[in-house]
Each structure stands twice: as structure tokens, then as C-alpha cells.
Amino acid sequence: MEGVGGGGGGEEWLRPMDAEQLRECGHRMVDFVADYYKSIEAFPVLSQVQPGYLKEVLPDSAPRQPDTLDSLFDDIQQKIIPGVTHWQSPNYFAYYPSNSSTAGFLGEMLSAAFNIVGFSWITSPAATELEVIVLDWFAKMLQLPSQFLSTALGGGVIQGTASEAVLVALLAARDRALKKHGKHSLEKLVVYASDQTHSALQKACQIAGIFSENVRVVIADCNKNYAVAPEAVSEALSIDLSSGLIPFFICATVGTTSSSAVDPLPELGQIAKSNDMWFHIDAAYAGSACICPEYRHHLNGVEEADSFNMNAHKWFLTNFDCSLLWVKDRSFLIQSLSTNPEFLKNKASQANSVVDFKDWQIPLGRRFRSLKLWMVLRLYGVDNLQSYIRKHIHLAEHFEQLLLSDSRFEVVTPRTFSLVCFRLVPPTSDHENGRKLNYDMMDGVNSSGKIFLSHTVLSGKFVLRFAVGAPLTEERHVDAAWKLLRDEATKVLGKMV
């Protein structure tokens, strides 16, 4: 096996799927990954390379002959890893998490081994049927209304990202509205969201042909942790109705990106219902927490929703990508996204006896993503997954208390889940209201490589985000981050004197 570990290689690499070669290489890759995780704290959390660094160290054309695995591992260690920002580091507190786990990793391995393209039931019945079953399991864990189950008119499907989930929901809503009001009414369709809604909705509107001037961005209520005020939505809607426009879609969020705000679902749901609008709920981040009984109330009002999404790949130990979408009536999704060319026709599909997930998504091809979610649920169980969520929320609460113990800092919004929004309080003489002060503090700790934070802007304030959610994070990592922040705060405040 020269091409695997030793010298030349030659014909060894003309067998792309040899079981024994896979066994040897696979063992070595698993060892490499395990060693990476064991030593992950030794790496700077935020990559410290400069743009274009990789072009300087890799050749400008592909090799004519096969290289060795040893050489490849060396290049990964010396050239690739320096350019990796380590999302699985226990000191990663920047964006909402992207969880990995042994179960998720094993599921990805098995999915890669089967390497099916499961666009219809016939292409791999197990892929379709497992997805239906696991999404029903998850809906029951979240206590979603029975209409979202596959046994009713609705059902669940795995999308790549929440952006895709929001897009397909919007397309279904658009086509439902056009069917009711006429195909020439597109220019009158209006979407409602808040200024805290994820930018994915804006992109979805661009793709769906919704006029930019018909996207109502309602300013969130800073007195309600930046949740949207139903009264403001109703007011905007009334103005649009009087102008002859057609309100057709409301997007609410459970756990906004900037502050983890929870929009008032019951009130927004009633607005949507009263005006025959599609009501979508994006719980990409915080949906995972709602498997815990003490956080389930944040989904009260979901019974009025037409669609609901959350990301298992964020905070549910399921490797990226795995975004879960449920709809109350799958026919609207299928009518909007279905295509049926001759080469895809088959007996099972023609008999309408199976689910073809190609008609629930944008692309034709799809991966066997339900495997990893199934393995996460099987190997960890709901009780342990709830404990995992609670641990992160406890660590965020601990960090919040540390902030409150130092008068130099302020917690900008009340903590709801595992995100803490805070800033260094600027001196009264600071005409920038702390923007540069907090940017410099963030840049200082990020440049150290010891932790990674991100920021947002709330009511004009430059605010730092401390998002707990990496699988390896313990209390000692939170304490170390706090010490680093205090030291950096002393440094940047000293420069202002």
C-alpha cells in the first residue's frame, strides 16, 4: 500500500473503494481527528492567518501522481489547521454554536459510506422513511401540534440550513397567495418581520421575487429584549391594507441572533390568522432548548404557525448540516416545489404511496442526513440531551453573574438561553458611546487566540456576544474567559486616561 502511507503509490490509487485500503486509511483518519480534539485547546480559537495565506504554501496546479497519506496529514497539520477557526473549541463563544459529537460524526461517516442521493423514495427507501420517523420523533419532543406530524396533513423534512427552510416556506406562502389573489398580484405581496429577524429572510425575499419595498422591517421593542411588538406589526399591516397591498407572510423568531429575543408568537399568530397570512417561526438556535419542559413555553403559539424550523446542527450535537422544517400542510410545499420529469417517474411515486422529498426542497439531490440525527437520539437519549442544553444555560448564567459582579461591565439585555449580551461601560467623556472601547477589547481578546467573541449593535450600542454552546466547554473555560476580559478591560480603559 505504498500510495496509502509510504512512497510512490501508482496503481494502488486506481482502486478508489478498496475495503482494506479504507480500513487502514479510516483508522488513521479517526486517530488524527481524535488527536485533534485532544489538543484543540492548543490552537488559537480564531485563525490568525492573513487573507491569501494558503496560496503561498500550496502549488498552483494539481499533482500528476498520487501523494502519500503521510504527506497529506503533514500538510493538514502545517497548512490547513492554521487557517481553521475552531468552532468545537471549548473557548469558542462567538456565533451560535455548530455542534459536533461522536454520534454525529459516526452518522456522517455512515452517510458518506452509503453515499446515496435520496431525492425520491425509490432511490433509497430507508433514507426517506427514517427522515419521516425521526422528524416525527423530534416534533413530539418539542410538543408541536399533531398537524405537524406525517400522520396528519403536515410533516417534517431536513433542509441544509435555516436559510433554505425559510426560503421554501416563503415560496409555498407566495404561491398560495398568488393562487388566491391572481398571478399578477406578486407586486402587491407584503412580508412582515422585525429588524432582529435573520438576514436569511431578506435573501429569501430577493430569490422569491418579493419587491424590496414590500418587506416591512418593524423596529423591535428594546423594552422587551428586542422582541417585536404585535401592535407595531398590526399598524404596518393596516397601512398596507388601506393602500391596496396584500399582507401574506409573517416571520417570527424564537431566539434572535443578536439578543436571543423571543417574539410574541400567540399575538403574531392571531394577526396572521385574522388576515389569512402564512405564519412562519424561525427557532434555528433556541429550538433545541425547547425540548426541556422549563423552556417549552417559548413555543406557545406554535399551534397558529404554518411552518416551523430549527437547526439540529447548532445546539443539538448533530454535525452540520441538519436544519429541521415542519409544515402544517405539506400540499402547499409540494405544489410550489414539485417537478416530475419523465426520467424521475416510477411506480411508487405515481401511486402517491410514498414521500418524495425532492418536492420539499430547492435542489433535486439530497444527503442521508437523518442517519446522524437518528444516531444522536439513539446514542444520547432525550434525558442526556436535555442535560446538555441545561449545562450550557447554567454556564451562561454563571458568566452573567460574573459580569454583574464588576461595575465596569453591563449586561445589555436579559439572558434567556445561553447567550449573554454585554459591554464595557464607557466613561461619560466617550463621545463614541463605547464603540471603539468595546471593539478594542474584543479585538484584544480575539487576537490573543485564547477565546473568540463576536459582536452586534443594539439601540446604537456596540455589544459583545458571549454564546455558550461548544460541546467541550466547562466552567473553567468560562472563568478563564472572564479573567481575560477583565484584564483586557483594564488595558483598554487605561489607554483612555
From Swiss-Prot:
Classification via CDD domains: DOPA_deC_like
Cofactor: pyridoxal 5'-phosphate
Keyword check for rRNA processing: no
SUPFAM superfamilies named in the record: PLP-dependent transferases
GO biological process: serotonin biosynthetic process from tryptophan
Modified residues (N6-(pyridoxal phosphate)lysine): K314
Record-linked Pfam families: Pyridoxal_deC (PF00282)
One MF term in the entry's GO annotations: carboxy-lyase activity
Alphabetically ordered keywords of this record: Decarboxylase, Lyase, Pyridoxal phosphate, Serotonin biosynthesis
Family per record: Belongs to the group II decarboxylase family.
Protein name as annotated: Tryptophan decarboxylase 2
Lineage, highest ranks first: Eukaryota, Viridiplantae, Streptophyta, Embryophyta, Tracheophyta
